Amino acid sequence: RGLGDVYKRLKYDHCLYDILGRFKSGELKVEIPFIVSNHKDLEPIADSFGIPFFHVPISKSKHNQAQLKHLKLLNKYNVDFIVLARYMQIMPKNIIAAYPFKIINIHHSFLPAFIGAKPYHSAFKRGVKIIGATSHYVTTELDAGPIIEQNVVRVSHAHSIKNLIAKGRDLEKIVLATAIKHHIDQKVLVYSNKTVVFS
């Protein structure tokens, strides 16, 4: 149907494995032309699924060079939409502008609560009774794009941060896969920084 690529920035590979497994089984009817990451150790995962892998290191001094490499890859492979499988970086504005409501992110909290890089730690400090995951379209405002899918799981005082992270990772996989499927099936209508998702 369309072309998607998976951006992977940190060594959190649970969402990547899940997407590739669903792709391989035919659940996600989409082509994945390549995977790009700043970690070479994810290359064997891409190889095992027969998907081209590109290692693009990210640093403050080489941020512009990395951005240009990403744009070249996106254009070369005629990418239709982008999936950020725990990207954990701020997406460049020119890429967001080139793919309006076509960049799908997974955030490891129930937005709008606990934005940023360590929401499980923040949730633990607040003593929350539920944790969640949110998949949304990327906009120039951090973790504030139109929400496609969310889900939650109950937790208690007995859970450690490690427990919260483990429970959250299971949610992240399901929420991201559901959001991708809704996007592929053209079930998402965006308006006023919100979405209507048709069932």
Which residues are covered by each model-predicted region?
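Short, small-residue-biased leader/transition segments that mark boundaries at the very start
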Residues: 2-7
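Short, glycine-rich nucleotide/cofactor-binding loops
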Residues: 8-14
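Histidine-anchored nucleotide/phosphate-binding helix
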Residues: 15-24
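Short internal beta-strands
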Residues: 30-41
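Conserved beta-strand segments of alpha/beta enzyme cores
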Residues: 31, 52-54, 102
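Donor/substrate-binding cores of folate-linked one-carbon enzymes
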Residues: 38-39, 62-66, 77-199
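Short loop/helix-cap segments at secondary-structure boundaries that form the rim of catalytic
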Residues: 43-48, 96-98
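Adenosine-nucleotide cofactor-binding segment
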Residues: 47, 51-77
